[in-house]
Amino acid sequence: MLNVAGLAFADAGDSLFKNEKLTYDGHLFFNAANSAIQSEKYLLNQQLSNIKMGSELQVTDWNKMKGLLIYNTLPTPVAPQFYFEQFYDELQIESSNIFFAFGKKWLAFGNYKSDLIYKPLTKALGQTNEVAAIIGYDSLYYANASFFKPYSRISTSSLPLYYNLNTGVHNQSMDAGVSYLYSLAESQLFQYNKGFGGLLSQSLKTRVPGFATYFNLKYKKTSTYLTYVTAITPFALEDMSYNNRGASPKALSIQNSYDVNIKKFSFKIIGFYDYTFQALALGIPKQRLGLGLSATPFPYLGIQFQYSRDYSYRNNAIASGINHFVNGRNTKMNNLALQTILN
């Protein structure tokens, strides 16, 4: 079964006014996917959104505001139909590389680069969206710290604000770094998922910090993206379990792409492999591997095709979250997805 979606679109090039300080852009997504891969909407809702509208207002030379509004055709408790994925103010200290940011944005927990329609399972496990206050430094070496009010409280923690730390090194062709998250339960997948439902607004027995590391490299026509996300300690048995023990979810993703040019037509060939560990309760597969093609035949049109094969957890595996049980099914599933993007 194929599901196709499309909605109206507005482009900044046809705007009624233009301003040097205000820029905005939009993306319209037409998606076709078999029923298996369509279920990923629940995991990474924003990836198959039908409309994304981004804007940036340069208030002064040292102050800018950014926003990204998304219209979701399949809303969830963590990503409603009209969803400000990002809306924040950023202050750059003059004559320095120090910045401050305040507002709603993705935390710097991992760096999940991808050339695919469906992003890696490491992103599913680690991406975290919060209303946060951030201080950072950005140059060849970078570091930042984010402070936020959590969605799920930990009964053993008295901290009023939780935090996220990130540091690394980058240039035009490489980005490598490590990240720390005070509570991995703040990730969107832990908050809401297809497995046991999610931890949104729940009180947890124990704190489970998260760790992420990444290495992204582009060399000539080849790109390589490697990411790893893990719980540092196991969850309490009552909060999340795997085979009758506290679960310690992990995910590893490897993606390689190669740019091909045939006369005036260029495209990317992409290969990828994802592996998860003790993540059955979250409703994501044990393994995923596949191939993809990505092309931009016109400046305003992008086309992506992806084939993947999912391997679920074995049928003797059992998991739970907040006393809701999830069983392994030992299935293999082929997934197809096609996406056209109007910019």
Give the residues covered by each predicted segment.
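Outer membrane beta-barrel
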Residues: G13-A36, E40-R153, S158-L159, N164-V178, ...
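Outer-membrane beta-barrel biogenesis signature
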Residues: L2-G26, I37, F265, L301, ...
